[in-house]
Amino acid sequence: MEYVIEMLNIRKAFPGIVANDNINLQVKKGEIHALLGENGAGKSTLMNVLFGLYQPERGEIRVRGEKVHINSPNKANDLGIGMVHQHFMLVDTFTVAENIILGKEPKKFGRIDRKRAGQEVQDISDRYGLQIHPEAKAADISVGMQQRAEILKTLYRGADILIFDEPTAVLTPHEIKELMQIMKNLVKEGKSIILITHKLKEIMEICDRVTVIRKGKGIKTLDVRDTNQDELASLMVGREVSFKTEKRAAQPGAEVLAIDGITVKDTRGIETVRDLSLSVKAGEIVGIAGVDGNGQSELIEAVTGLRKTDSGTITLNGKQIQNLTPRKITESGIGHIPQDRHKHGLVLDFPIGENILLQSYYKKPYSALGVLHKGEMYKKARSLITEYDVRTPDEYTHARALSGGNQQKAIIGREIDRNPDLLIAAQPTRGLDVGAIEFVHKKLIEQRDAGKAVLLLSFELEEIMNLSDRIAVIFEGRIIASVNPQETTEQELGLLMAGSTQKEAGKANG
């Protein structure tokens, strides 16, 4: 059997944690091989070893049967290995073509031969079905197009083995379909692909084999045709995982949040929320369903004080809170799990223990007379780290070093521990594995069952249908329908999200 990549007994450790513990990975020529594991299982670390970003303490790497020492990404490129990182590495002010050729520019008379560069980029683009605009600035193209540019960068450098690190985490459903077709085209052309992921549906749809990693150890390698999502999920987390969220019927109480006719503008001054009204009661989860870009983000920002409203009112337990400061709104009884945990949820270069106290550090017993009591802060942080199973070497580890799932658990613990009357959860499971998703869902339902009001924003229809007691459909900044998840389907919901009336959606669904 011809293996293009063999990683044998790879060990890589960081202070306080063994990320890869004698892992083996063998990739066949012309296959799409999934590397599956929870957030923090060691998948990206293993691939960073293969790409020369990390050096292992032990183990052997073979490329096309030959033992190699990969001490830098340049060495990996020379061996035909390319990596499409989860966080793209493009220069915003450069054109797509300039980004692709950066570092390997074709020269003519000592100067960059732009005509030849553009033609070479176009030729590769046409060959692999990666349609792009070479002269467009990287900052001006969609996330999906930026990813195509990253793929073309690896192909331009002659990669035969491509590593994709969580490639669908930031893509729309349509862009995900396009990416899967691109991967199929690459394999047809003789390329081999390693796909780092925790999305089981994608593995079943596109991969040939899968290697499961759990807590830094290689668990099993399987043919995808011989397994199923349930088996993969249990191998990944070490126990059975429920894909269906269990919850009893809601018992709504008094109105907690009342939004009445608000209008909100985005950063360009364009109205993105228009005369919108919505209510959330104690003891219920209200889900907001809509295609991204229809005013959801601005709505959440207005409720949490991150954006001004131009008209209308927002009341919490009968008191108006619109246009108050974020701290005053928080102290009035709102917890916020933000859509972008890095931008609005954490200070990445602070210890995770201090991040957990970001909403409370100025209160007793953590602060007195302007002096922080670090001992009390870290004592509280340790208890929440244990309660919410935040996997970290210790409470002093910087938030940046934690996996996405553990970062999210820390945020959820911080917000729920404050005992808010209204919990706003915006994209709470984005980028998380099935085990972490199950954990988040249980916590949201626990809040509902404790009599709290929960406002859920998600672009995952399955999540909205599973968790919500009521679904409010947003389109072009307005709530155009309110539906009972027990009485609708994903198809009908999708039509409503595209702007159909309830009557039209019902007919199409019928």
From Swiss-Prot:
Assign the protein's first listed, main location to one coarse class: membrane
Record's note on what induces expression: Transcriptionally regulated by CodY.
Q: Name one GO cellular component term.
A: plasma membrane
**Keyword tags:** ATP-binding, Cell membrane, Membrane, Nucleotide-binding, Repeat, Translocase, Transport
* CDD domains named in the record: ABC_Carb_Monos_I, ABC_Carb_Monos_II
Asked if the keyword Secreted belongs to this entry, the reply reads: no
> According to the UniProt entry, what is the EC number of this protein?
7.6.2.-
Q: Where is the ABC transporter domain?
A: 5-240, 257-501
Query: Where would you find this protein in the cell?
Result: Cell membrane
Q: Specify the protein's topology with respect to the membrane.
A: Peripheral membrane protein
Question: Which residues participate in ATP binding?
Answer: G37, E38, N39, G40, A41, G42, K43, S44
Q: Where in the sequence is the signal peptide annotated?
A: none
Q: Name one GO molecular function term.
A: ATP hydrolysis activity
Which protein family is named in the record?
Answer: Belongs to the ABC transporter superfamily.
**What is its quaternary makeup?**
The complex is composed of two ATP-binding proteins (NupO), two transmembrane proteins (NupP and NupQ) and a solute-binding protein (NupN).
Task: State the function annotated in the UniProt record.
Answer: Part of an ABC transporter complex involved in the uptake of guanosine. Responsible for energy coupling to the transport system. May be a nucleoside transporter of broad specificity but with various affinities for different substrates.
Instruction: State the name under which the record lists this protein.
Output: Guanosine import ATP-binding protein NupO
> Could you tell me which species this protein originates from?
Bacillus subtilis (strain 168)
Q: What is the lineage of its organism?
A: Bacteria, Bacillati, Bacillota, Bacilli, Bacillales
